[in-house]
Design a protein with these regions (language model features):
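N-terminal helix-turn-helix DNA-binding core of bacterial DNA-binding proteins
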Residues: 7-49, 71-83
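Histidine-centered divalent metal-coordination motifs
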Residues: 21, 55-56
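Intrinsic low-complexity/disordered segments
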Residues: 47, 52-53, 85, 104
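Short, Lys/Arg-enriched C-terminal cap helix and immediately downstream tail that follows
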Residues: 64-66, 72-73, 88-89
């Protein structure tokens, strides 16, 4: 996903709007790439079904926030640092722009 415009930023916020997906990202962020977690481990830690975890991972993966790597017969997931940093920069940039607009409006009054 390319986070260069407002529609992409809105899509990112939509992906992050689900509490389970945020919990998944936090769990995965605590891991290092070699210590990625499989669906079963994530489901156990979150107390949700493997099916629910798989669906949420699919959304996170399609947004580019998570990567999967096959290890044996399981896929282990980890944070995609590059995309996460890009998304963070885009959000920060958008928020700074909003601050400048707000400052300009308050000066006009």
């Amino acid at each position: 996903m390319d986070y260069e415009n407002i529609d992409d930023e809105a899509a990112l916020f939509g992906v992050l709007a689900d509490p389970t997906r945020l919990k998944l990202l936090r769990l995965l962020a605590q891991q290092r790439e070699p210590n990625a977690l499989c669906v079963n481990a994530l489901a156990c830690r979150l107390g949700v079904t493997q099916s629910a975890v798989s669906q949420h991972l699919r959304v996170l993966k399609s947004a580019g926030l998570v990567k999967g790597e096959r290890r044996g017969y399981r896929i282990h997931y980890f944070i995609n640092q590059e995309t996460l940093m890009q998304a963070q920069q885009q959000i920060s940039s958008a928020l700074r722009l909003e601050e400048r607009i707000s400052d300009g409006n308050s000066q006009e009054k």
